[in-house]
Amino acid sequence: MNQPVSASPVVSVGSVTFGQDRPLSIIAGPCQMESRAHALEVAGALKDIAARLNVGLVFKTSFDKANRTSASGARGIGLKQALPVFADIRSSLGLPVLTDVHEAAQCAEVAQVVDVLQIPAFLCRQTDLLLAAAATGKVVNVKKGQFLAPWDMGNVVAKITGGGNRNILVTERGASFGYNTLVSDMRALPILARTTGAPVIFDATHSVQQPGGKGASTGGEREFVPVLARAAVAVGVAGVFIETHPDPDHAPSDGPNMVPLREFEALVRRLMAFDALAKAADPACPE
């Protein structure tokens, strides 16, 4: 069995900390980078919300949605256009930034302007990609593949630590259940924490996806995002990943499972209350 990263890990992303016994932190932003103006608008709104709630927040968005259902699906503004936008968000807003990488050759360049490199779920076993991300020294957030058991992620994390990087987050985003459906097994959250030794993130929006559910695009059931997010926080996680958009019904990707930006603050406020209760010390209720 692979050795976990540590018994009680804390991973810092700028001023934001992720730990199983630390207050909840949030990773949030639109599915894809649609334009510089759109990214800065959403990032600015999220920064204001995080300040009001006093919650740690990492901004996320993707420069390329390489894994689209259809070849005609919008993919984002692309790597070269996105790099200066990532830099602007970090410098002008002071927010740490996360984005996903799809090829080993992208890692070093992207790492110059972001704080977290994310490994997509479908690529979580790609050894060259994991090693290239590890070599940057940046925090690596690796999503558990929909096809993997939670205990299988020990081998994935071992590849990253074997590459000399112990700054790792592990994200649960559901498991394939028949056709066009994902389910969230809440047992996976403590199993991931125990097996990998890394702080665990729950991806509340991708967990309600219906992959390929609309034929040429992915469907989703965003009404269940708060339900699953509350359940995960009650079980105990280091953070929650939430994709949000000012107008998700007209977003170029993942609209059916994104949370409307106007609903984001109330959702996070409630999750913080659940988190405080879940992590409160109570000697009468041992784990």
From Swiss-Prot:
Could you identify this protein by its name?
2-dehydro-3-deoxyphosphooctonate aldolase
Q: Where is the signal peptide?
A: none
- UniProt-listed InterPro entries: Aldolase_TIM, DAHP1/KDSA, KDO8P_synthase
Q: Which gene encodes it?
A: kdsA
**Keywords for this entry?**
Cytoplasm, Lipopolysaccharide biosynthesis, Transferase
Q: Which GO terms describe its biological process?
A: keto-3-deoxy-D-manno-octulosonic acid biosynthetic process
User: Could you confirm whether the keyword Transferase appears in this record?
Assistant: yes
Record localization: Cytoplasm
The record's annotation in HAMAP family points to: KDO8P_synth
What Pfam families does the database record attribute to this sequence?
Answer: DAHP_synth_1
Q: What is the lineage of its organism?
A: Bacteria, Pseudomonadati, Pseudomonadota, Alphaproteobacteria, Hyphomicrobiales
Q: Which family does it belong to?
A: Belongs to the KdsA family.
- Organism of origin: Nitrobacter winogradskyi (strain ATCC 25391 / DSM 10237 / CIP 104748 / NCIMB 11846 / Nb-255)
**Which chemical reaction does it catalyze?**
D-arabinose 5-phosphate + phosphoenolpyruvate + H2O = 3-deoxy-alpha-D-manno-2-octulosonate-8-phosphate + phosphate
